[in-house]
From Swiss-Prot:
Its main location: nucleus. It comes from Sordaria araneosa. Pathway: Antibiotic biosynthesis. Transcriptional regulator; part of the gene cluster that mediates the biosynthesis of sordarin and hypoxysordarin, glycoside antibiotics with a unique tetracyclic diterpene aglycone structure. First, the geranylgeranyl diphosphate synthase sdnC constructs GGDP from farnesyl diphosphate and isopentenyl diphosphate. The diterpene cyclase sdnA then catalyzes the cyclization of GGDP to afford cycloaraneosene. This is Transcriptional regulator sdnM. It is found in: Nucleus. Signal peptide: none annotated. GO terms for cellular component: nucleus. Keywords: Antibiotic biosynthesis, Nucleus, Transcription, Transcription regulation. GO terms for biological process: antibiotic biosynthetic process. It comes from the Eukaryota.
Length: 499
């Protein structure tokens, strides 16, 4: 916990602040996370700070300086200062200078993972081990740190070594989702490269909420595709109880990173597409498209299912869910002016499909290409105007009726949730304008991250079987992370070693 955690009384209200309630969808994500980039380059912290400050001083972007509070009814609201000062900064910025030592001499950070070019690899140590060494000692961490202290939404911490730099951005998920964070990084990079005129217009919480207009005057929303599979009260309690039971008897779980050589993924995808074409000779080859990410979702779910202990019963339902961004659909509906905007808010929804465990593991398992095709079809189905309207309406109705979001499937199902960050091109973010002079003199053309650590606070009860596809490096290696039980990790590692 950071220094902020000690205080429990909220700061007094400043009369000149602009007060705005949080949007419905944003209130669903009351937790914080760190997003750390590791460079094997020396970057200038002041250049980075000045560029970030330039972005946040722009029209609209100053909203990121808002403070978080609860009103008299315990509803969340933003308090946006009229002016920022040293006492009430626009963003938190801290540095940690270790330029007299190499990152290779740091007792923990010298273990930053590097891909194995020959086979898939699960890396040690766990993400939580790196996290505490990549953030500021007094950086906000828990949700209450923002509620009970007069601090802005964004904290940036820079750690400098003689041969490396770590940039950690800490923020609340109530502020925005992954693509909102990527909009900030894009604006930051454009500013560093002197291309501020290309920064997309900002839309934030002071603007009209595009999700509030989703129904577009309809008296009754469309029916959600899985509406008939919503579990009732007892099914929901059963799902929660099974999770708690698993956490109680198997307390050891961790978020860990694993890498897949580019050639391995290429072979996996080529094989999957060939299987799909063979299964559907009536289709044109171009109509049998599945992306690398579709294939990885299906393949990794199979690994998770077959390495559970005790084994999943063949008939047990597996729910494979992809979190997808709705900004394109909102623009299509005219609720956002275009896709080229910096929309700060949460706009991710679920694209799911259900299959028995036997489809992923065992003698009767389906071919990878067919499972990947189900991933693709579920995304195509859910990323429609009708199904976005239906899912959003179901969220709001269930939250008002039960206090929680709806759960679809069965109370004893295995849920595997994926977040695909590939679209953000994280490993292609070039911070070269911030290189110090000695680095530029070496003729370096780019400064790209070699490792990305995206984490939040973990507890014994944190969700399991959740996976992120972090992206593809310049060398072609794929980076992923997943939170699994320790015994499942051990079996997957053994399987990787046999490859």
């Amino acid at each position: 916990m950071g220094l902020f955690s000690a205080k429990r009384e909220p700061p007094p209200v400043v009369p000149t602040d602009t007060i705005t309630p949080l949007r419905f969808v944003d209130e669903l994500y009351p937790f914080a996370f760190d997003f750390s980039l590791v460079f094997r380059d020396v970057l200038d912290p002041e250049v980075l700070r000045a560029a970030a400050d330039s972005v946040l001083q722009r029209d609209g972007w100053r909203q990121l300086g808002a403070r978080l509070r609860r009103d008299q009814n315990s509803k969340l609201e933003y308090h946006l200062p009229t002016h920022f000062s040293k006492e009430r900064p626009l963003f938190l910025f801290t540095t940690d200078n270790h330029t007299d030592m190499s990152i290779n001499d740091h007792p923990v950070l010298r273990h930053v993972p590097e891909p194995n070019p020959d086979r898939p690899t699960v890396h040690q140590p766990a993400a939580a081990t790196f996290r505490r060494h990549m953030r500021g000692p007094n950086s906000p961490e828990a949700f209450d740190d923002w509620l009970y202290n007069d601090i802005p939404q964004l904290a940036i911490h820079i750690i400098s070594f003689s041969d490396a730099t770590i940039i950690t951005v800490t923020l609340l998920h109530t502020l925005t989702d992954f693509l909102g964070l990527m909009a900030f990084y894009k604006a930051w990079l454009l500013t560093l490269h002197g291309r501020q005129d290309e920064i997309a217009p900002y839309i934030g919480y002071l603007d009209a909420d595009p999700l509030e207009g989703l129904q577009q005057g309809q008296a009754k929303p469309p029916k959600y595709v899985f509406a008939d599979r919503e579990v009732g009260r007892w099914g929901y309690l059963k799902f929660v109880f099974r999770h708690m039971w698993d956490c109680y008897w198997h307390p050891e779980a961790s978020l860990r990173f694993f890498t897949l050589p580019g050639k391995f993924v290429e072979n996996l995808s080529t094989s999957a597409r060939a299987e799909l074409i063979a299964a559907h000779p009536e289709r044109k080859p171009e109509d049998c498209f599945v992306s690398d990410s579709d294939v990885l979702c299906a393949w990794w779910t199979g690994l998770m299912v077959r390495n559970q202990s005790p084994a999943c019963p063949p008939a047990q339902s597996v729910c494979l869910t992809n979190r997808f961004d709705s900004r394109d659909v909102l623009a299509k509906m005219g609720l956002l002016p275009s896709t080229n905007i910096s929309f700060f808010g949460n706009a991710a929804y679920n694209a799911s499909f259900f299959a028995p465990a036997s489809a992923f593991a065992g003698p009767e398992k389906e071919k990878l290409g067919l499972l990947a095709n189900q991933v693709r079809d579920s995304i195509k189905l859910h990323r429609t105007v009708e199904q976005l309207q239906a899912q959003d309406a179901a969220f709001r109705e269930s939250k008002a009726r039960t206090g929680h979001l709806p759960l679809y499937g069965e109370g004893d199902m295995m849920m595997c949730v994926f977040t695909n960050c590939y679209r953000g091109r994280l490993y292609q973010m070039d911070f070269s304008p911030a290189l110090v002079d000695k680095e530029k003199s070496k003729g370096k053309k780019q400064a790209l991250p070699v490792f990305i650590n995206c984490t939040g606070m973990e507890s014994r009860w944190s969700a399991r079987n959740a996976t992120a596809i972090l992206g593809k490096s310049e060398n072609g290696d794929w980076w992923m992370s997943s939170r699994l039980r320790q015994d499942v990790w051990e079996r997957i590692e053994a399987e990787f070693e046999r490859m």
